[in-house]
Amino acid sequence: MKVKICGVTHPDDAWEAAKAGADYVGMIFAKDSQRCVTKETAKCIVEAIRDGGSEPVGVFSEHSIGEIIAISSATGITSIQLSGRNIDFKFSQLRELFSIFYVVSVYSNGQPSAAIPPMSNTVTVIYDHIGGERGTPFDWRAFSPFQHDNWMLGGGVNPGNVGEAVRLLSPRGIDVSSGVERPGVLRKDVTLMQALIDSAKGVGNLTS
């Protein structure tokens, strides 16, 4: 069971996530996100987790291919998350350069908004509640993932419901952002991160 702590905005939070057992730490570069980070901050986050066992992931949406390559090169990021318009074209151009997380938006009723292109299991598909950063889950009981084994569940996961999510859907991983933040605070909470990671990995080990 893999866990990705996304929307990290501070190097200290990244270090705490790594120490808690996060497999991935995500940094958002989308300018319309309240968790958007600068290249300078992202570089500090990458440095903070260099020896902590977590892999840094750059989260991109409406960026051009050139921008994605430039930002990743400047910050030391080798894994990227793609979403938004022209995702399939960007995926086809970048799949040989980076480890890729491919986002599929899911409607509230549990129906994916689009199909996925052919891809190997080295690509991680993330199913996220449409719109992103909602903090609420889509209908897990009505949801059925595509025929692609390597996938993560995102959107509305938190320490209180992650066990149910893992038991119900058996994802390969969990992607969480606001679910490990206190209300009104855009910093990650150490206690919430540890609780979510322990629960996800504990239940995941029992169901695998």
Curated annotation (Swiss-Prot):
GO terms for biological process: L-tryptophan biosynthetic process. Pfam families: PRAI. It is an enzyme of class 5 (isomerase). It comes from the Bacteria. GO terms for molecular function: phosphoribosylanthranilate isomerase activity. Its EC number is 5.3.1.24. It catalyses: N-(5-phospho-beta-D-ribosyl)anthranilate = 1-(2-carboxyphenylamino)-1-deoxy-D-ribulose 5-phosphate. Pathway: Amino-acid biosynthesis; L-tryptophan biosynthesis; L-tryptophan from chorismate: step 3/5. Keywords: Amino-acid biosynthesis, Aromatic amino acid biosynthesis, Isomerase, Tryptophan biosynthesis. HAMAP family: PRAI. PANTHER family: N-(5'-PHOSPHORIBOSYL)ANTHRANILATE ISOMERASE. Belongs to the TrpF family. This is N-(5'-phosphoribosyl)anthranilate isomerase. The lineage of its organism: Bacteria, Pseudomonadati, Chlamydiota, Chlamydiia, Chlamydiales.
